[in-house]
Amino acid sequence: LHTNSVIFAFVGNGIFAGVYYSLPRLLKTPMWSRVLSWTQFWSWQAIIVSAAITLPLGITASKEYAELEWPIDIAITISWVLFGINMFGTILKRREKHLYVAIWFYIATWVTVAMLHIVNSYEIPVTLWKSYSGYAGVQDALVQWWYGHNAVAFFLTTPYLGLMYYFVPKAANRPVYSYKLSIIHFWALIFIYIWAGPHHLLYSSLPEWAQTLGTVFSLMLIAPSWGGMLNGLLTLRGAWDRVREDVVLKFMVVALTCYGMATLEGPLLSIKVFNAMSHFTDWTIAHVHVGALGWNGFLTFGMIYYLVPKMFRTSIWSKKLANAHFWIGTLGIVFYTIPLYFAGFTQSLMWKQFTPDGYLVYKNFLDTVLQIQYAYWLRALGGTLYITGLFFMVYNVHRTVRQGNFLALEPAEAPAAEKSTGKESTGGYWHRWIERRPIQMLVFSLIAVAIGGLVEMIPTFLIQSNVPTISSVKPYTPLELQGRDIYVSEGCYNCHSQMIRPFRSETERYGEYSKAGEFVYDHPFQWGSKRTGPDLARVGGKYQDSWHFYHMLDPGKFVKGSIMPPYPHMFEKDIDLESTPRKIEVMRQLGVPYDESFIATANDSLLAQAGRIADNLAKGGIEVDKQKEIIAVIAYLQRLGTDIKVKPAAATTTTTTTGN
């Protein structure tokens, strides 16, 4: 819910507000359709409300940045298409010959987000609010992080770069520092960014060549990213004295600084030695919030403080309150991120520390959790400060609107034309040609962003050796499949990974490192990206059924110091037996080798296995109905990692072992 609120509600509405304000002024024409503008606005708010309702109810696809289920995915597609039609309708009827740099980023954003959303949302519905991903295991992970990384790139970055190229020059009353640099920045950024997704999967079961591509292109990203940051900051040349007094410029300078910090740190974290330390820790959480709070948040605030007085023909109601917002927001970012950086360093060091005799110092994962709880309290303080500043802005804007007079129609504006060099008569810069042709800009942008995805995904989907199989790995039983779906709906993937990396510290703690062939029936994959709790890839058979029963009932009481919430409803709610045949049927459509005849008898198999687990619990004095959800969850957890725990005589040649 938190992630989707930031992306769809906070950043999404910031994008649309900025585009709907800047686009008519850059093109010297009103938006093409007021009806489409309002329809798109209300449809987007409906999507936000639907996310706020469905996610807490456990209706989730479990794919990071793409958790929303298939009906909402369709609604997102429709709303995005409406936005695109309106944007291109406005561009095509423009009264300005050339497209300004901000519009290049708007166009690339629209076409790339459309491509990412359609490809990643390939799923087969099971019920109205449940679907299974069309991809499995390694393939699903690659597609997801091709999407996930580029959701950050083309929803949290490129549209905001477009807004930066409009609002920073307007607020500073200065032209963009370098037109040529903006060209290089744009094309290099959109081409390189799309390749970098695999850096989220380093040391995983993803093929090594794909991981290497992700690392190389991530490092290359530093150049265009910093080119854009410098182009923005150098636009303020001659106006730095105003930064002390102008709250709009203050917000924008900090936003650009945070953008530079995040886009340097991100590529550095794609270097394997750093990634080995940062992945699964709070270091990553700190990193993304420098971008979300500093770059997206502060640029949005600066934009609002600029455009609201313009729209209502007045000055901001209270400059002191706006400055208070700036400083309390900055403190909020500091208190939010710095403790999480320290928590991340602590987690990594504790996870990897061995005694002189070669044993893990902190064998119990909970030791790390207890050590960093201070960081979560400081994070809460930082978030409170940041939200308090936001309320300052809301009140300030409210009073500004009340004292002003809304300007319904404003004379359109555009940046001053560049001084003629005489080259225009003979064709000018090569880029001038494409700046006058929005459809060609759209097509070339699509080609630039599609290349990387095709190169990374086609081999993984077509070359079988990239996803090796293990003969002992079998599909989930109906009960385990139901348990897996409950695991997903409860959001367990947010705190637990299912990917053991090939480090001695991890194999000592969790067991043998994960193989690609283990996940061929996982629709969707559950590798995770954060360990608030221990990895579960090899948890099957590690504890008795009764341990899982009591642990799910009251984790804090059963494991002293645990911050895991209890799940009492699992002990009251029955398994949805009616959905079992449909789930097996959809899995068959996705290529999971269930016999067709098994669909009709799936619930018989489910109840038989559930009965065995209930009988086993009864031996320990635990009486529970075999149809309760907790039985399915126990079945799923006890299955994890057991397929490759076979006797030596039954082991296949594709299964390898690690030695210490």
Descriptions of predicted regions:
Residues 1-59, 71-91, 103-128, 145-171, ...:
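Hydrophobic cores of alpha-helical transmembrane segments in multi-pass integral membrane proteins
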Residues 464-488, 502-503, 532, 619-629, ...:
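Electrostatic cytochrome c docking/interface patches
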Residues 1, 5-6, 141-142, 427-435, ...:
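Sequence context of c-type cytochrome heme-c attachment sites
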Residues 388-400, 533-534, 543-550, 619-658:
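Extended amphipathic secondary-structure runs
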Residues 483, 489-498, 548, 633, ...:
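The canonical Cys-X-X-Cys-His
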Residues 406, 410, 417, 422-476, ...:
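Post-cleavage N-terminal segment of exported redox proteins
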Residues 445-450, 508-629:
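Electron-transfer interface patches adjacent to heme c in soluble/periplasmic c-type cytochromes
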Residues 495, 561-567, 644-652:
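Surface-exposed patches in mature extracellular/periplasmic domains of secreted proteins
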